[in-house]
């Protein structure tokens, strides 16, 4: 959401106000209340991720909508879709974005749910498809595949959460100096973002990969960008600790054996990572 907003700042003269978060990664609702009270008549849109794709922290969207009043509220629910209860009606948002690739569907297809009372400018002009918002012949196979993937319901949230809790408990037992980012907030079942003091995430990532364990240093949409996570910086990390963090993801096909294997290699990885950081 940040990149389109920043584009509007650079090219359309818009003003962007980034709402701070707490150390747990939850939106600072008091700040938002003050902002709306002071400048509500100037605000065109409030846009908040339903859950963060790096930490899994779930935002209080319904409360944001209440604070916003008549201001339109958009939520990017791509990460949350099928992973946690998600009701467009109950949240009360103006619009919600979803994507197929997060639920096992094809890349390049998604959905924008928008209240009928609102009209938005066309992204592409032409034949008038997609209610004249996005012209072009509809990709029927991808649409059908998206619907099938969303309906399959193969993701068992309770099972995945049990695996995550097993992983985090084992991790903290073997590496007591590590800490889980967003642990005090409501989180998605399958994401664990961990900081390992005294290490560098790039080194840890290579070591984990050599041990046949897949993890990441941040979101896939920023992969390959060697800079501290803006998410962790917003949560109060300095650049050093932000670059000492890894994201572990568990999915529908993850097993207890996967978790136990990852835990078995972590002590060696952390030890070697700290040694490399001291050179």
Residue ranges of each PLM-predicted region?
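Pyridoxal 5′-phosphate
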Residues: 1-279
């Amino acid at each position: 959401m940040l990149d389109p907003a920043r584009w509007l700042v650079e090219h359309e003269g818009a003003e962007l106000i980034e709402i701070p978060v707490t150390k747990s990664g939850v939106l600072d609702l008091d700040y938002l209340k003050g902002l709306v009270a002071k400048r509500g008549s100037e605000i065109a849109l409030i846009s908040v991720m339903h859950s963060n794709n790096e930490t899994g922290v779930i935002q209080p969207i319904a409360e944001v909508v209440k604070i916003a009043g008549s201001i339109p509220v958009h939520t990017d629910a791509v990460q949350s879709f099928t992973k946690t209860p998600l009701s467009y009606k109950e949240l009360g948002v103006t619009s919600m974005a979803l994507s197929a690739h997060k639920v096992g569907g094809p890349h390049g297809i998604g959905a924008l749910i928008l209240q009928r009372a609102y009209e938005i400018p066309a992204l592409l002009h032409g034949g008038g498809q997609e209610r004249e918002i996005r012209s072009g012949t509809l990709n029927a196979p991808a649409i059908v595949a998206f619907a099938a993937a969303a309906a399959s319901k193969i993701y068992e949230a309770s099972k995945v959460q049990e695996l995550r809790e097993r992983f985090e408990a084992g991790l903290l037992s073997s590496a007591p100096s590590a800490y889980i980012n967003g642990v005090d907030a409501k989180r998605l079942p399958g994401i664990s973002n961990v900081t390992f003091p005294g290490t560098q995430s790039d080194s840890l990532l290579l070591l984990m990969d050599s041990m046949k364990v897949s993890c990441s240093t941040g979101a896939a949409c920023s992969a390959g960008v060697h800079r501290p996570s803006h998410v962790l910086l917003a949560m109060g990390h300095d650049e050093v600790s932000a670059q000492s963090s890894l994201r572990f993801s568990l999915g529908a096909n993850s097993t207890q054996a996967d978790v136990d294997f990852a835990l078995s290699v972590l002590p060696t990885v952390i030890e070697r990572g700290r040694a490399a950081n001291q050179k």
